[in-house]
């Protein structure tokens, strides 16, 4: 199971690195000050692969700018990371970001539960500009969650699927068993509702092997 730990400041890196996650996600939208300097400092502190994310408010983050501002912020930072999360709304800038030598995690977060055909269309759209699609939805029922698990199992790989909210938080540990590329956790302050601490996620991963 590939575990990603989300952080929102450079000071947390030493503590996070002790848990040896597969990736560290830098939540740019939750950081203050000079972002480029902070990301550079994180890069100098660790060899763990980095994901840069500037999450929009509409998809659960704090960034409220337009696509051009998003690109002006993320563009100079891309050189210091390995993967950049690019929401569908910013996809026109994906070729420029990819030209920096990084992979694109093409993402869409919704508070709805799409049907399986809709999930397939979202997957296809995200693959049109990214290397790894990331689809995060909000199941309303167990049947919804079953459909998400089935979709994940049958989808082209790689793919990352997850859920929004705390009601079905256990899906964060289950979906990787059915083919989801990553699961996201925290090491102190959750960056999304329902996230497990990496200690808990490792325990779950070990128990579910």
From Swiss-Prot:
Highest taxon above the source species: Archaea
Binding site for 3-dehydroquinate: 6, 25-27, 55, 172, 191, 195
SUPFAM superfamilies recorded: Aldolase
Documented EC number(s): 4.2.1.10
Keywords in alphabetical order: Amino-acid biosynthesis, Aromatic amino acid biosynthesis, Lyase, Schiff base
InterPro entries from the UniProt entry: Aldolase_TIM (IPR013785), DHquinase_I (IPR001381), Type-I_3-dehydroquinase (IPR050146)
Enzyme class: lyase
A biological process term (GO) from this entry: 3,4-dihydroxybenzoate biosynthetic process
Catalytic activity entry: 3-dehydroquinate = 3-dehydroshikimate + H2O
Membership in a protein family: Belongs to the type-I 3-dehydroquinase family.
Protein name listed in UniProt: 3-dehydroquinate dehydratase
Organism field: Methanoculleus marisnigri (strain ATCC 35101 / DSM 1498 / JR1)
Gene assigned in the entry: aroD
